[in-house]
Amino acid sequence: MLNAVDAKLTTDFGQR
């Protein structure tokens, strides 16, 4: 669960 959230957050940060 945390992995998925971390991946999403990382992607969001990377895109931003």
Swiss-Prot record:
It comes from the Bacteria. Transmembrane segments: none annotated. PSII is composed of 1 copy each of membrane proteins PsbA, PsbB, PsbC, PsbD, PsbE, PsbF, PsbH, PsbI, PsbJ, PsbK, PsbL, PsbM, PsbT, PsbX, PsbY, PsbZ, Psb30/Ycf12, peripheral proteins PsbO, CyanoQ (PsbQ), PsbU, PsbV and a large number of cofactors. It forms dimeric complexes. Belongs to the PsbU family. One of its GO terms (cellular component) is photosystem II. One of the extrinsic, lumenal subunits of photosystem II (PSII). PSII is a light-driven water plastoquinone oxidoreductase, using light energy to abstract electrons from H(2)O, generating a proton gradient subsequently used for ATP formation. The extrinsic proteins stabilize the structure of photosystem II oxygen-evolving complex (OEC), the ion environment of oxygen evolution and protect the OEC against heat-induced inactivation. This is Photosystem II extrinsic protein U. One of its GO terms (biological process) is photosynthesis. It is found in: Cellular thylakoid membrane. Its main location: membrane. The gene is psbU. Keywords: Electron transport, Membrane, Photosynthesis, Photosystem II, Thylakoid, Transport. It is a peripheral membrane protein.
